Amino acid sequence: MGEVKVSPDYNWFRGTVPLKKIIVDDDDSKIWSLYDAGPRSIRCPLIFLPPVSGTADVFFRQILALTGWGYRVIALQYPVYWDHLEFCDGFRKLLDHLQLDKVHLFGASLGGFLAQKFAEYTHKSPRVHSLILCNSFSDTSIFNQTWTANSFWLMPAFMLKKIVLGNFSSGPVDPMMADAIDFMVDRLESLGQSELASRLTLNCQNSYVEPHKIRDIPVTIMDVFDQSALSTEAKEEMYKLYPNARRAHLKTGGNFPYLCRSAEVNLYVQIHLLQFHGTKYAAIDPSMVSAEELEVQKGSLGINQEEQ
């Protein structure tokens, strides 16, 4: 098995951050699993939403780094929900249970789409203060599978896994990306048939984001410019949808940059959250803020962030 699963960082994470399970629906089979780390005094934390293949722990490198810098971070794993409205209603109940009025959301792929749908769903009584959308999309029709969305629940687990694995990089990749793919395959193997079927249904069910409902929310679009499951057209559509978004470009990183390019991803997350420091929506403990340090780090990595 890949290096990530046996790495000291991952083992430290699993040994120190407890996995919590929370039920907020009448149906007690719908269980949210989450890691909640960092200062509980922070009332507007950053919440990570995983892709189809991911579990909450795929963001362990963000949790370790960001909590070390004073941020409160929550990484989630979804219950089995079969449509976007059901997901949004369940997520709202979860935030109520956690007593969080507003949050920042980082969504990867499907997680990014669900983050946008939740912001849209709560636009009259906003719960989302900002969005970071990583390798994400705004319209499920890009996958050309809306016609099969209603039949995923019938398919056996091995077939569903094959569909998901079809989007993983198959060409040559560097060792860190190979390790990330191995880890994600392992995480995929841990998901049951209903979990996978429901996520693929959410990923492909005919739906799109209505931008006018969420146009006032600060957005960072994080894209990778090597092999990823997203087409150039899908990326361009996101830029059009959010013309004022900050753009965080990673030259490489594939589908899972939060695992194999974590230093860059973590830095972009810090840069995004910096705009809220000193407000009641800061995701960081005020005593830990050091903008100068962040600027030095930004310069040393030589990352070019384009704002448009």
Curated annotation (Swiss-Prot):
Entry keywords, A to Z: Cytoplasm
* Keyword Cytoplasm on entry: yes
- GO cellular component term, pick one: trans-Golgi network transport vesicle
Task: Tell me yes or no: is Cytoplasm among this UniProt entry's keywords.
Answer: yes
**One example GO MF annotation:** CD4 receptor binding
Q: List the disulfide bonds.
A: none
Where in or outside the cell is it found?
A: Cytoplasm
Q: Where is the AB hydrolase-1 domain?
A: 87-159
Q: Enumerate the InterPro entries for this protein.
A: AB_hydrolase_1, AB_hydrolase_fold, Maspardin
Q: Which domain of life is it from?
A: Eukaryota
Query: How does this chain assemble?
Result: Interacts with CD4. Interacts with ALDH16A1.
**PANTHER family cross-referenced by the UniProt entry:** ACID CLUSTER PROTEIN 33, MASPARDIN
Family, according to the entry, reads as follows:
Belongs to the AB hydrolase superfamily.
Write out the function statement from the record. May play a role as a negative regulatory factor in CD4-dependent T-cell activation.
Q: What is this protein called?
A: Maspardin
